[in-house]
């Protein structure tokens, strides 16, 4: 079943949307590839930045917030991720109505302003407002339109284009942790934040200039049906639910691989190196599988990658105790989890009308936001109830991946039937 037929087949649930002539999709060209480059840079400074904020946990506990528990401090970093994803439906609706320039420009100001204010913050509420709320919402206004815009320029190459776009977040997840680790002891917290903010500002100038959309955007009056309409589409709801469980599973290793490694005897310095290893490997996970997906079918490759993620968690991370096993898991899980993040937007495009693409991407990310916010506390509570062991926390992650895989498999059957060799 082709992408074109799928797109046409999903116009039914959104009949209330304004009728716009379908744009010509060039599948290449200077403007299209500049959009991919700008979008990758935008994800570098938004999603890539959020990948490294856990490094501030020890800084806050030692200095600015030394009177607070580690659990209290962790809300600052987890809430930034939550705000980035949960406000994505609003970012997506702005994209659908005005194109990428308006939301990305507003987001650029908020993201940089939030980080600058965080550099001056000394109290809990100040850091929560500046880093979690203002910077988080700004990241959402950058992240969602940037991830969506390149998809309007391509049809046959959507997989690899989606992978190249989100690969920027992988590079950010490597560069920013290394920057922060080296800058904190040399220039202190304030100037570390300012240097990162100035770097982000410069890169966002490039993103604002280069990102464009191939779709005609028209402002729409507020209508409840525009917001609830996609949720009447069974295929879309299945993808939302599957995404929730996949993100429920993904963020357990992201959040606990370091503390679990230290718990089982790895040195602190080596344990922290697992973060750039995982993020570095995810670069390949967000590009190579996406290229294969354009040839073999995007749903097919996604289901394989979610299954492999479950196997890695349950068969490798769960019994792992030595340094070699944990490093191997970090690298391999970086590849499979990177593919899940990279292919996610491409699947949304495949079952959605272009006129609602931004909002639908944002809605799926909002479901994912609930997973990212709740899975770390649940995983921590499971470990605490098990005497500090992470055995059942790993099981929770692996089972979440399996449930997400079943949801994707059910959606694939609805779209193309039971044929295992069907490209879908």
Swiss-Prot record:
InterPro entries: MFS (IPR011701), MFS_dom (IPR020846), MFS_trans_sf (IPR036259), Proton-linked_MCT (IPR050327). Glycans are attached at residue 208. One of its GO terms (molecular function) is transmembrane transporter activity. Pfam families: MFS_1. Residues 1-10 have a biased composition (Basic and acidic residues). Disruption phenotype: Does not affect the production of oxopyrrolidines A and B. Its main location: membrane. The keyword Transcription does not apply. The chain crosses the membrane at residues 36-56, 102-122, 127-147, 160-180, 187-207, 239-259, 265-285, 299-319, 329-349, 364-384, 391-411. It comes from the Eukaryota. It is a multi-pass membrane protein. Keywords: Glycoprotein, Membrane, Transmembrane, Transmembrane helix, Transport. It is found in: Membrane. Residues 1-23 are annotated as: Disordered. GO terms for cellular component: membrane. Belongs to the major facilitator superfamily. Monocarboxylate porter (TC 2.A.1.13) family. MFS-type transporter; part of the gene cluster that mediates the biosynthesis of oxopyrrolidines, polyketide-amino acid hybrid compounds with feature structures of tetramic acid. This is MFS-type transporter opdF.
